[in-house]
Amino acid sequence: MLFSRQIAASAALVCLAFTGSSAFADEHPYSEGQVVNVSSIRTLDGHFDDYMKWVATKWKQEQEAAKKAGDVVSYQVLTVEPRTPDDPDIFLVIYFKNWAALDGSIAKGDAIAKATEGSVAAANKAQGDRASIRRILGSQTMQVLNLK
């Protein structure tokens, strides 16, 4: 009997320890928010409006299709004054509900490419053709931390 009481007491102590650590985890001064992807774009001289025409048509169609599918929460386009020739002049910003919204992104992207461009091959060609009017400097994916 004494042995079973010791086991019960040990089990209770372990449960209490885990309860305390989960309570501590709930005390973060923030909660996880949306996931944000920011693409940095530099348009080539004289091609800002050419690129923005594509953004206002095809890119917007892609984002609206992703919103309709429930993958994208919102999106926006920001313009910025570049400091150097290698700085972006446009940021394309896409907001996702969470990291899980990015699961299966290749298949989702292919489906949207087929719907907006006719085929993945046509979308790839169009992507390459836009190199004559802009440079993609990179992108970052980050998560919003909502302060409590």
Language-model regions, residue ranges each:
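Short beta-strand/turn micro-motifs at beta-sheet edges
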Residues: 25-29, 78-81
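Sec/Tat signal peptide C-region and signal peptidase I cleavage site
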Residues: 19-25
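Short hydrophobic/aromatic beta-strand micro-patches
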Residues: 42, 93-95
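N-terminal, post-signal-peptide region of Sec/Tat-exported proteins
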Residues: 44-88
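Bacterial N-terminal signal peptides that target proteins for export
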Residues: 1-11
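An amphipathic, aromatic/His-enriched active-site/gating alpha helix that lines ligand/cofactor pockets
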Residues: 27-30, 61, 65-73, 95-143
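Immediate post-signal-peptide N-terminus of mature secreted/exported proteins
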Residues: 26-50
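Bacterial N-terminal signal peptides
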Residues: 10-19
